[in-house]
Curated annotation (Swiss-Prot):
Originating gene: Acot7
Enzyme class: hydrolase
GO biological process entries: acyl-CoA metabolic process; coenzyme A biosynthetic process; fatty acid catabolic process; long-chain fatty-acyl-CoA catabolic process; medium-chain fatty acid biosynthetic process; medium-chain fatty-acyl-CoA catabolic process; palmitic acid biosynthetic process
Presence of the UniProt keyword Transferase in the record: no
Organism for this UniProt entry: Rattus norvegicus
GO cellular component, one term: neuron projection
Keywords: Acetylation, Cytoplasm, Fatty acid metabolism, Hydrolase, Lipid metabolism, Repeat, Serine esterase
Residue intervals passing through the bilayer: none
Modified residues (N6-acetyllysine): 169, 199, 284
HotDog ACOT-type domain sequence ranges: 51-169, 225-339
Domain observations: Both HotDog ACOT-type hydrolase domains are required for efficient activity.
Cited InterPro entries: Cytosol_ACT, HOTDOG_ACOT, HotDog_dom_sf, Thioestr_dom
Name assigned to this protein: Cytosolic acyl coenzyme A thioester hydrolase
């Protein structure tokens, strides 16, 4: 079968220049199966893929993609994941004749950073649509890193994203999603369970959206106030889609930066993103808004730190709209020594009743995820 591809950035002879390529249809299936075979992992395909239901993208990691430790910034990886997700979901939602739309990111499920990615390696991002409801699309994304000198590849990230199609004529109008065809009825039922679970969790998150991070003067070390941090960012054209709304990947990268600052202030060592709990996008952010991204420590185990990150948007040029909560998530960071081995972290000292409550909630999430990992029997690549 012919390769249906569009090259977005050309390779320049003799130079390492970033490139993206989009592949659809059966060629994408071949790429995905080849990657998984190279890692000795077998993955059953979830749906019957038609052209546009699966894409593969690749880009070489440059020095400006690095964090202060020299590895690829976790926010950069999150941004690449979201770019793949928005392409495939927008393409699918416009696959039938009807009102044109753009897919908006509503939620990112828990994302684990399985292995660091290095500058000079090639990031391979593959995305596929695995479930559709009446008004939402589930996209599963895998990220592989390739050392182009040795040819070795490794799985670095897995993520599940949910999108909703918004009309180009009226961005407050959610359109219907074209259905996909499943190989087995069980796969559709499993997808429906995932949809209902994330829908319930999103509702629970909205109930907690009244929290505000307040600065404290002269806080004591190891307290929540000591490491809490904020970034203020004016949303410009380069942050937005063609329709004037912030890319979800831009928001996620800013959230990861704030979480990293909080973690570094708390332990004062090299830190890396270990995982991201579900990121919920509660409302759209328009061009021209001033966004405040605030992070605070909620829980520490022996070698990990949980940081809650909140994104508030202030439409400064629109007096009719007040400041609102746009997104929220929990990030988990680990402290590393010079050899890249995990270090014990200073234990958080919660002071107020709210801080103690958040600490216990974080402990519950930590123990739940620890039990899930210990009971996970799927062979790892």
């Amino acid at each position: 079968m012919k390769l249906l591809a569009r090259t977005l950035y050309l390779w320049e002879v003799g130079r390492q220049v970033a490139s993206w390529s989009l592949t659809s249809g059966q060629e994408c299936l071949v790429l995905r199966e080849t990657w998984w075979a190279s890692m000795r992992a077998v993955r059953t395909r979830a749906v019957h893929h038609k052209p546009g239901h699966c894409i593969a993208m690749g880009r070489i990691m440059r020095p400006d993609d690095a964090n202060v430790a020299g590895n690829v910034h976790g926010g950069t990886i999150l941004k690449m994941i979201e770019e793949a997700g928005v392409i495939i979901s927008t393409r699918h939602c416009n696959s039938q004749n009807g009102e044109r739309c753009v897919a908006a990111l509503a939620r990112v499920e828990r994302t684990d950073f399985l292995s660091p990615m290095c500058i000079g390696e090639v990031a391979h991002v593959s995305a596929e649509i695995t479930y559709t409801s009446k008004h939402s699309v589930e996209v599963q994304v895998h990220v592989l890193s390739e050392n182009i000198l040795t040819g070795t590849k490794k799985l670095t990230n897995k993520a599940t994203l949910w999108y909703v199609p918004l009309s180009l004529k009226n961005v407050d109008k959610v359109l219907e999603v074209p259905p996909i065809v499943y190989l087995r009825q069980e796969q559709e039922e499993e997808g429906r369970k995932r949809y209902e679970a994330q829908k319930l969790e999103r509702m629970e998150t909205k109930w907690r959206n009244g929290d505000i991070v307040q600065p404290i003067l002269n806080p004591e070390p190891n307290t929540v106030s000591y490491s809490q941090s904020s970034l203020i960012h004016l949303v410009g054209p380069s942050d937005c889609t063609l329709h004037g709304f912030v890319h979800g990947g831009v928001t996620m990268k800013l959230m990861d930066e704030v979480a990293g600052i909080v973690a570094a202030r708390h332990c004062k060592t090299n830190i890396v993103t270990a995982s991201v709990d579900a990121i919920n996008f509660h409302d759209k952010i328009r061009k021209g808004c001033v966004i405040t991204i605030s992070g605070r420590m909620t829980f520490t185990s022996n070698k990990s730190m949980e940081i809650e990150v909140l994104v508030d948007a202030d439409p400064v040029v629109d007096n009719s709209q007040k400041r609102y909560r746009a997104a929220s998530a929990f990030f988990t960071y680990v402290s590393l020594n010079q050899e890249g081995k995990p270090l014990p972290v200073p234990q958080l000292v919660p002071e107020t009743e709210d801080e103690k409550k958040r600490f216990e909630e974080g402990k519950g999430r930590y123990l739940q995820m620890k039990a899930k990992r210990q009971g996970h029997t799927e062979p790892q690549p």
